[in-house]
Amino acid sequence: HPPFGHAGEETLNDLMSSNNGFEHNQQSLRIVELLESKYPNFPGLNLSYEVLSGIQKHRTPFDQPDLDPSDTYLSLEAQIVNIADEITYTAHDVDDAIRANILSDTDLIKNVSIWREYSNEICSEYTNLTDKQYVYLMNSKLITNQIRNAISNSKQNIQRSGVTSLKDLESLTNKDLIMFSPEFRAGIDELREYLFNHYYSNHEIYRSNKKGQLIIRQLFLALSSDFKLIPKEYYAEMSTDSKERIICDYISGMTDSFALSEYQQLFS
């Protein structure tokens, strides 16, 4: 993802609307096929078809909530990456929300059944936990149980499907085999919905996203007005690309902290 995550991606896509837009999966392909230059005889990293396909078709419910799974063929490796990504950001988002005091354990116990279940298990097993230890154990259990359920259910799906090759997978009507069980998925969806309604839509998070979008927009405009602000060695080998695409490449490769630092140097 570019700096400031999905908010940054939306801004770059808007700024690049007249230049084929910006989408982070396609940008990842651009990086590994063109921008990374490790070898003298060809651009990119010379990755396998399976890896490139996984990058191109990587998706999560946050990225593409309305995407029909049957619309896109995904290798098993790509499906594993997708669910691993979801497992990670679900746990990290809960942890971030609690640490930021946007959500409380009491809120989650009251409104999210899977959180309530895990809390009861931990409290019956441990006594005298500090708040920090409790939250750590809750996130550990959330991650572990997601992994275990995904492995168990996916193994059953693969066995039932009879898939033994890429060709077999391509011929399936339902190609998504790496997934949670329906019952477990319902619990995770309840947690995700609660996060969306009470964390992602939080006023402070909204303000933070708007700040990130402002930084990216101002950087883009500044670099567009004075191309020399970009290090020459960065764009020297990309002379065939449009100025806007080079600027987009440069900004999308920044970290949050580097983008903020560049903004402060230019505008403070």
Positions of predicted regions on the chain:
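Aspartate-rich (DDxxD/NDxxD/DxxxD) Mg2+/diphosphate-binding motifs
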Residues: H1-S18, F22-N25
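Histidine-centered, transition-metal-coordinating active-site segments
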Residues: N25-Q27, I31-S268
